Amino acid sequence: MAYRKRGAKRENLPQQNERLQEKEIENNTDVTMENKNNNRKQQLSDKVLSQKEEIITDVQDDIKIADEVKKSSKEESKQLLEILKTKEDHQKEVQYEILQKTIPTFEPKESILKKIEDIRPEQAKKQMKLFRIFEPRQLPIYRANGEKELRNRWYWKLKKDTLPDGDYDVREYFLNLYDQILIEMPDYLLLKDMAVENKNSRDAGKVVDSETASICDAIFQDEETEGVIRRFIADMRQQVQADRNIVNYPSILHPIDHAFNEYFLNHQLVEPLNNEIIFNYIPERIRNDVNYILNMDMNLPSTARYIRPNLLQDRLNLHDNFESLWDTITTSNYILARSVVPDLKEKELVSTEAQIQKMSQDLQLEALTIQSETQFLAGINSQAANDCFKTLIAAMLSQRTMSLDFVTTNYMSLISGMWLLTVIPNDMFLRESLVACELAIINTIVYPAFGMQRMHYRNGDPQTPFQIAEQQIQNFQVANWLHFINNNRFRQVVIDGVLNQTLNDNIRNGQVINQLMEALMQLSRQQFPTMPVDYKRSIQRGILLLSNRLGQLVDLTRLLSYNYETLMACITMNMQHVQTLTTEKLQLTSVTSLCMLIGNTTVIPSPQTLFHYYNVNVNFHSNYNERINDAVAIITAANRLNLYQKKMKSIVEDFLKRLQIFDVPRVPDDQMYRLRDRLRLLPVERRRLDIFNLILMNMEQIERASDKIAQGVIIAYRDMQLERDEMYGFVNITRSLDGYQQINLEELMRTGDYGQITNMLLNNQPVALVGALPFVTDSSVISLIAKLDATVFAQIVKLRKVDTLKPILYKINSDSNDFYLVANYDWIPTSTTKVYKQVPQPFDFRASMHMLTSNLTFTVYSDLLSFVSADTVEPINAIAFDNMRIMNEL
């Protein structure tokens, strides 16, 4: 009863922090054991004294203790299990957090699989509007006396005017514009998709897009528009040449916009699609595999098009010196591969109960005399067998390093490990793990069989235990088997331009299992002279269990090889082999499960699974290459624009983000900079280079169309009169710098030498500071007088900061508040500054009207394999590369 009181009080204690909760979970195990003892004592006292149970109430805390406190031993054990499970889950969460912190690019598996499957050809690039930087805008015209005229004039202005001030920032703006164009650059343009009706047309004609239609509408309604232009707009319509599948649409575009769109139209990525292309798109080994029956739909329209995937190989060599990046790529490939490896379901495996019963009979475990032999049956289940099968194939497909987990005293695990090391190349295992497993096999099975002393292996020895043992063992069959394992490596073969890691032919056809069995038989016949009889008997029975399944092991090896090679045909990136930062754990008990439970049912990937795996690989690979092209282009553009402050690391970060699978903040800096250096060495792709040259040639025109910045300022010691300008009225503006001494503002900021400006001004010589400056307008004459002189020159000379330079544009015209004050009193305002602003390009309808040509219609297919219907032969009849059934043991 005392226990109950204590328990009740403990439950009512306030939980001050999370640490107390953790301590409670850990202490619960001890408390539960105490519960057992107390309950037993309670039962005894109840039997002796009374059958009634008292309910003790703690008056002070008002806590009621329920009748059900007395629990059965079954309930207690259940509670104990729950506590232990909670503790185990908590430890897993802690390990998960540690993993997240230590592995730079670690992410949960489900999210990685979703990310890699969601990478698809970018259908968003199907344009519904033409690409435009400029739009025409109406501006008033001012007479010589500053009064506004009734007529207007059209100029080309920026659609989105976000130009910053400062030459460097302007160049950075152009880099961002370039990046935006690269993202928006269409793979193909079909003008018919974006064409809209021309409202002013006589016969329901169409123009190329909605913006062209709205411009035509505005010009048509403008009173200043000439009659001939109105008649022309009324006649604007598409011209169709159906026999050539061509259509021409009228468009109104700035010459620079026209150059971009014309380039996009002439350099589309779509190519004609026919049955031969689809046939060649299917991996050759799948086409030639007699287990798959493929049929193709022959009814492809002549207008069918496709975008060829960009499958260039190894341009960055991410396997070389990019440990965390490579780890993430192999992890995502592993997770993807696991999702496509066929499952060994329970109906394909031998019944676990029946098999364990048979093994028990073989081991003669009725007496259960030897503890070690009971371990042979531990952990054998169909789930572990399936997990092992998927892990082995997925790890080889993704070239993920595996680490082995085993107990040395479980001889059955070690004997299963001998099969594993025989069929899986050594490269696939973590070196330390491989050495530990080999050493356990040598010291537990091989050396004791021949009465040899234990091998004392020196850590760091270049030779593995099996390599040392091969030289010391005299028995031919065992030495021959060791020799095979020591030389079991992947063969690198280039198939269809892709580097494949292929298995040894002896493994593919399963003959190596006979070699393994010969070695095992030799070992079981040995006397184990230095070991007790029970030890010898345990090893022999373990070998007997495996050798009884010789036929199934041959079939399993052939099945493993076939599934690996069939799925490998769907891989498009070179299979580079490098040990990975993290490993996939493999329990040797699960290998035992696979060896003991494999049945005679053949499982091969379904055609739909293969096509899905192939499509995901193609999409990821193509996206990877396109993002490389973007990053290389941006790095080259940043260098050519002389963006010396641009952090190249940010470009590399954007590149990795666009690959979808990386957790960019966790990638170490050294790998970021190494990646930058690799990207710098690559050439720029042709389309991207041409687009950049178009921007480079027209930077001045784009800058000129902005209302946010001026191109410089002229500073004088004496006042200068305001001049008449058709666009603004009377202004302190100049359209030319001829006759002025010019100083570059960016150079001035970098050197900080203001002496030259001061000397020139003191000598009464005006000086022109050239650079992108904020274009501030102020039309109030009163504020103009207040800010005069002190605005520009005094501040920059005093503070030595050019970035504070904000020359004000003084506009005096009939729109300004004080225009009549100036006009009536013949006041001629002056200023010590003149803003240098280039004239935007006037809108000329005739020069802006362009005919754009594209195909009248075509259909772009992104999934070529949707045309292929596929089926498989009956799995029992499926044959391997040697024209024999994959699984012969029926």
From Swiss-Prot:
Segments for region (Disordered): 1-46
Entries under Pfam families matching the protein: Rota_VP2
Keyword Ubl conjugation among UniProt keywords: yes
Cellular localization per UniProt: Virion
Record field: compositional bias (Polar residues): 28-42
Keyword Magnesium: no
Source domain of life: Viruses
GO molecular function terms attached to this record: RNA binding
Site keyed Interaction with the intermediate capsid protein VP6: positions: 232, 236, 849, 851
Region (5-fold hub): 1-88
Post-translational modification: Sumoylated with SUMO1 and SUMO2. Sumoylation of viral proteins seems to have a positive role on viral replication.
Keywords: Capsid protein, Inner capsid protein, Repeat, RNA-binding, T=2 icosahedral capsid protein, Ubl conjugation, Virion
Residue stretches in coiled coil: none
GO cellular component, one term: T=2 icosahedral viral capsid
Chain intervals for the UniProt region annotation (Hydrophobic): 404-424, 432-452
Record's function text: Inner capsid protein that self-assembles to form an icosahedral capsid with a T=2 symmetry, which consists of 120 copies of VP2, with channels at each of its five-fold vertices. This capsid constitutes the innermost concentric layer of the viral mature particle. It encapsidates the polymerase VP1, the capping enzyme VP3 and the genomic dsRNA, thereby defining the core.
Entry remark concerning the domains of this protein: The N-terminus binds RNA. It is necessary for encapsidation of VP1 and VP3. The N-termini of 10 VP2 molecules form a cylindrical hub underneath each 5-fold axis of the inner capsid.
UniProt similarity note: Belongs to the rotavirus VP2 family.
Assembly behavior: Homodecamer; each decamer is made up of two conformers of VP2, called VP2A and VP2B. Interacts with a VP1-VP3 complex. Interacts with the intermediate capsid protein VP6. Interacts with NSP5. Interacts (via N-terminus) with NSP2.
Name of the featured protein: Inner capsid protein VP2
Organism of origin: Rotavirus A (strain RVA/Human/United Kingdom/ST3/1975/G4P2A[6])
Lineage: Viruses, Riboviria, Orthornavirae, Duplornaviricota, Resentoviricetes
